Amino acid sequence: MLLWSGICGLSPPRIFPSLLVVVALVGLLPVLRSHGLQPSPTASTIRGSEPPRERSIGDVTTAPPELAPESRPVNHSVTEHGMKARKAFPVLGIDYTHVRTPFEISLWILLACLMKIGFHVIPTISSIVPESCLLIVVGLLVGGLIKAVGETPPFLQSEVFFLFLLPPIILDAGYFLPLRQFTENLGTILIFAVVGTLWNAFFLGGLMYAVCLVGGEQINNIGLLDNLLFGSIISAVDPVAVLAVFEEIHINELLHILVFGESLLNDAVTVVLYHLFEEFANYDRVGIVDIVLGFLSFFVVSLGGVFVGVVYGVIAAFTSRFTSHIRVIEPLFVFLYSYMAYLSAELFHLSGIMALIASGVVMRPYVEANISHKSHTTIKYFLKMWSSVSETLIFIFLGVSTVAGSHHWNWTFVISTLLFCLIARVLGVLGLTWFINKFRIVKLTPKDQFIIAYGGLRGAIAFSLGHLLDKNHFPMCDLFLTAIITVIFFTVFVQGMTIRPLVDLLAVKKKQETKRSINEEIHTQFLDHLLTGIEDICGHYGHHHWKDKLNRFNKKYVKKCLIAGERSKEPQLIAFYHKMEMKQAIELVESGGMGKIPSAVSTVSMQNIHPKTLPTERILPALSKDKEEEIRKILRNNLQKTRQRLRSYNRHTLVADPYEEAWNQMLLRRQKARQLEQKINNHLTVPAHKLDSPTMSRARIGSDPLAYEPKADLPVITIDPASPQSPESVDLVNEELKGKVLGLSREPGRATEEEDDDEDHDGGLVMRTKEPSSPGTDDVFTPAPSDSPSSQRIQRCLSDPGPHPEPGEGEPFIPKGQ
């Protein structure tokens, strides 16, 4: 009654997960028995005097195995009549050993699924504690319950982990890998994965060897190679733990791909170091040849795994070309070829994780072009489901195996391992980031460095590698396993639970949940082509150049072999537009918005439909003239500052330009021309009305030169619209003043009136000229001795510079021949 009243007092959101846990634990009761359902000792004692009963298998009656054929009771009356004794047909029978293995597997998977449902039903728990932490706690509780009833808890075998639980998680990560972010940051990822892992392994192994020398009698017998082996196991960042934590905090794409990419690509380093130190530990003496071979094995393991993955990816893509009539089996090829790539790599002791990633990345674009939309949906959801279940089982069995395993605790060794792991991670990230930022355009800020260092989580890969150690060759493997479990629990619980509040506290940029529109995708591709052209012009071949080369090779050769039909010949931009338009149409139909579709013909339609012409409407409002002038001024002022060289750009790597000296001379001439133009602008008169900008004037004159015919009696500026930015495109035509306007016969008052009339009626840019000065004199007006006073006053008036123009208002007008 007390239990029932306690359950009734819970709120509905808390009752549901509690019932799920109870149902799962009740389902696990048969597993708690050692070998299925067996009678209790009391029952067997009571029935001890009775002979063993016969067990029926189907419709055949068999005698118990402990009775010999001679000791069977014989019914003489039945024998005489030639009849055999028969039992009644068994209506109900129990044979747990027959279904034990699949039944227990199903129960564990059911427990994992119920736990995931229960955690997300209570939002207060899932928002504070990561799912991986809760799953480990459930594993600890289940393992403790199994051990409390006197049974041995199941242990996470390394073969089960590496062959069945890990491949789905890596395949899901490799198949849906954000390829653009991965390739743009591949150099940074490789430095963190290779150099960072080597630093952690040797730094941790060397310091732990020093600790063992002064740590006491229990750990004095651990040698240098044993400590280096232990450092190689514990140094690698675990992809399962990183995925479980980073997907919940929704960190930005850059940090996510850096940490997750490091956890994927450090597998080759971990495998090589593990096998290398495991072999060296059995040698009496390690020579230079062994070290060189170990160094070469890194390239064999990593590049060999990539090669195996690429081969299986190409085969999978080629096979999907012929599945147009059998759509049902299309998803199966993706799973089988990927899994065979992993097994083939493990067969030759290559990196299976690298093989899975390479196969998923290579096959995806070609397979998705060949298979149907339903098959693509099946692949997506099956991979997500498979990887989620595997991840849940890994964390649950990690908790159960902690209870089931044998441990050897040493405070000095365990605490030193935990402390040195944190120090090595921080120092490695800081040092490598300082080096990487010298070559990156987008620098890694101190906040980014903190998240990268804090996100170096350890997980089940280190636990399984520690469990693989042979106790005969490594007597201290129990101590290693205890230290590994301590580091895993600290990183998952402490760092995993505190990383979300720290991200919010530091205001780290989060991932954008909204997808990019068609406009953004098209402009992104346009910018890629533009940057490729810029790299070709300056001779700096970056990743845009090689990406363009690879795309051209892919379009010219690979697509024709791996993609069926006309899809291989379709331009990428048009194919993407078709895909996005179809996606939007499907979403519109599913949302019930068909009544709002306009009656305009689609450009994708294959039918020749001629609808009624609809009145064209301007989507965006027209900009005002003031706003347009403001934008032009901003562009003119800022486009001059784009002549900057990146830090990764080195002019000494370019081919020597024979025209560089001529270019420098041209720049000097332009600088002198600008100085001359500043002097000329001082002699410009200001019209009465507001003038258009020089850019608008050039455009107007270039479009219709006859409509703006200048006056014949004034000096004008002739503009060549074909090349407005060339110094030779502007010519100053000085026409002689008709009838010697400035002569003595003209009166000063009349000259002033004519000048005012010219300023009122002129709509263009007018330049007044003065008499050329003699050589060796400056531009200051000096009257000649023969000039009359009226002529001197007129020329002094004309030489008045007037008000200066606003800075940055017009573009320079450079006279020809200066």
Curated annotation (Swiss-Prot):
GO cellular component, one term: cytoplasm
Family: Belongs to the monovalent cation:proton antiporter 1 (CPA1) transporter (TC 2.A.36) family.
Oligomer and partners: Homodimer; dimerization is crucial for its function. Oligomer. Interacts with CALM in a calcium-dependent manner. Interacts with TESC. Interacts (via the juxtamembrane region of the cytoplasmic C-terminal domain) with CHP1; the interaction occurs at the plasma membrane in a calcium-dependent manner. Interacts with CHP2; the interaction occurs in a calcium-dependent manner. Interacts with EZR; regulates the cytoskeletal interactions of SLC9A1 and promotes stress fiber formation.
InterPro entries with a match to the protein in the record: Cation/H_exchanger_CPA1, Cation/H_exchanger_TM, NaH_exchanger, NHE-1-like, NHE_CaM-bd
Region spans: PI(4,5)P2-binding region: 509-516, 552-560
Membrane topology: Multi-pass membrane protein
Region (Confers pH-dependent PI(4,5)P2 binding): 540-545
Residue numbers carrying Phosphoserine: 599, 602, 605, 648, 693, 697, 703, 723, 726, 729, 788, 790, 799
Note: Predicted models used for more than 20 years predicted 10-12 transmembrane segments. More recently, the structure of SLC9A1 has been solved and reveals that SLC9A1 possesses 13 transmembrane regions.
Gene Ontology MF term list: calcium-dependent protein binding; calmodulin binding; potassium:proton antiporter activity; sodium:proton antiporter activity
Keyword Ubl conjugation found: yes
Keywords noted in UniProt: Antiport, Calmodulin-binding, Cell membrane, Glycoprotein, Ion transport, Lipoprotein, Membrane, Palmitate, Phosphoprotein, Sodium, Sodium transport, Transmembrane, Transmembrane helix, Transport, Ubl conjugation
Organism: Sus scrofa (Pig)
Protein name according to UniProt: Sodium/hydrogen exchanger 1
Pfam families for this protein: Na_H_Exchanger, NEXCaM_BD
GO biological process, one term: protein complex oligomerization
Region called Disordered, residue ranges: 39-76, 739-818
Post-translational modification: Ubiquitinated, leading to its degradation by the proteasome. Ubiquitination is reduced by CHP1.
Extent of Polar residues compositional bias: 785-794
